[in-house]
Amino acid sequence: MMNNTDFLMLNNPWNKLCLVSMDFCFPLDFVSNLFWIFASKFIIVTGQIKADFKRTSWEAKAEGSLEPGRLKLQLASIVPLYSSLVTAGPASKIIILKRTSLPTVSPSNERAYLLPVSFTDLAHVFYLSYFSINAKSNSFSLDIIIALGIPHNTQAHFNH
């Protein structure tokens, strides 16, 4: 049963999206266009279309570190998500399960931690517009689903 579901309305001029499902948050590094996640499970858009990401293992670089390693996920793009976001209408919504806070797990040798952020912050940083509604549904079984638009300053990386 899902309560307090957020629907992100996509507003992306390149019609490209990065969809990330995670259990725990890790630092985001947009210089190398990588998302750090602990476990990616489901990516669901309206119509129950599922997409998977390629995952590669990453080990902590700190010498003598007991970090078991984490998963490294390259920034993914779906071009296009639909033939046209204009004509897709409600189908361009992505369903996410809202949580009030996101646990962060970061190795001690890393300088920055990803603090819990609100979806308002995400919408501002990643150029998304959204609205919130309350909904109840037993049709989905998923963890945190986040839809991220490609930031303007990384667009050049996707032209190569």
Curated annotation (Swiss-Prot):
What main location does UniProt list?
membrane
Q: Where are the transmembrane segments?
A: 24-44
On whether tRNA processing is a keyword of this UniProt record, the answer is: no
Q: From which domain of life does this come?
A: Eukaryota
Query: Topology with regard to the membrane?
Result: Single-pass membrane protein
Localization per record: Membrane
Instruction: List, alphabetically, the GO terms of the cellular component aspect.
Output: membrane
The UniProt similarity line reads: Belongs to the TMEM191 family.
Protein name in UniProt: Transmembrane protein 191A
Organism of this sequence: Homo sapiens
